[in-house]
């Protein structure tokens, strides 16, 4: 990330970053340390409050509570867009990314990571190992019943509109995130687009095993040097 921001500053003289869905600001710290001016948007009011408190004395961070997800459609130009585990929360993620690309200035970058691969392109082994790892993690958390109930609803294609776990994780409704379609949006307007597929799960032990033996479940995209 330091290298990313540094190269943008070298080309453009600054690096103004929009971080979509910043959570509690862990990644924001790295961006600021690298020399970026960061605007973070967060749909969750409690998370936005945590961010405001965390960066209350930092003039290089602006926090916006964006409950309706509309702030990303503003016209102001940007040097970089960062999306950490957030595209699968956006109903029309392709439309959102297409607009964000238009805001990125020449020489800028787009970076996203930790979104689930498009289900129709995944093997049965990939899906089954992913589901099994999730249930084992829930068991370790003492929440196996909750995990099983969520999985059963998803397998049946029936979703509880009152349940945040169902309705904020849009990828389970629309079968993941189409990484190839996103790559197709980025490729014509960036000089270099890298798609990385990898295994990812919540359990540290299962993560270590999966990195060695399991098929990919998740992806990241890194588009450099906007045309």
Where do the PLM segments sit?
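Conserved alpha-helix/loop element of class I SAM-dependent methyltransferases that forms part
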Residues: 1-14
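Conserved class I S-adenosyl-L-methionine
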Residues: 13-23, 109-151
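Class I SAM-dependent methyltransferase SAM/SAH-binding core
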Residues: 24-70
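A conserved beta-strand element that flanks and buttresses the S-adenosyl-L-methionine
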Residues: 82
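A short glycine-rich, Lys/Arg-flanked "PGG" loop and its adjoining helix->strand segment in the class I
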Residues: 94-106
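Short alpha-helix
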Residues: 173-190, 195
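Core SAM-dependent methyltransferase catalytic element
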Residues: 189-191, 206-227
């Amino acid at each position: 990330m330091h290298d990313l921001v540094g190269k943008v500053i070298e080309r453009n003289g600054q690096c103004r970053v929009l971080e979509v869905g910043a959570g509690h600001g862990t990644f924001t710290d790295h961006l600021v340390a690298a020399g970026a001016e960061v605007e973070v948007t967060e749909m969750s009011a409690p998370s936005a409050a945590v961010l405001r408190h965390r960066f209350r004395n930092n003039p290089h961070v602006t926090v916006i509570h964006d409950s309706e997800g509309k702030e990303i459609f503003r016209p102001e130009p940007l040097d970089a867009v960062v999306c950490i585990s957030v595209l699968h929360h956006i109903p029309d993620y392709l439309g959102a990314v297409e607009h964000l690309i238009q805001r990125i200035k020449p020489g800028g970058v787009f970076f996203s990571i930790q979104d689930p691969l498009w289900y129709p392109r995944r093997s049965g082994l990939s899906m089954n190992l992913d589901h099994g790892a999730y249930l084992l993690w829930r068991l370790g958390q003492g929440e196996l019943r909750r995990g099983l109930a969520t999985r059963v609803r998803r397998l049946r294609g029936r979703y509880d509109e009152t349940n945040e776990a169902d309705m904020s994780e849009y990828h389970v409704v629309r079968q993941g995130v189409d990484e190839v379609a996103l790559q197709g949006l980025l490729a014509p307007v960036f000089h270099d687009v890298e798609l990385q597929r990898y295994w990812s799960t919540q359990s540290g032990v299962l993560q270590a095993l999966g990195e060695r033996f399991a098929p990919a479940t998740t992806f990241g995209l890194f588009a450099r040097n906007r045309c």
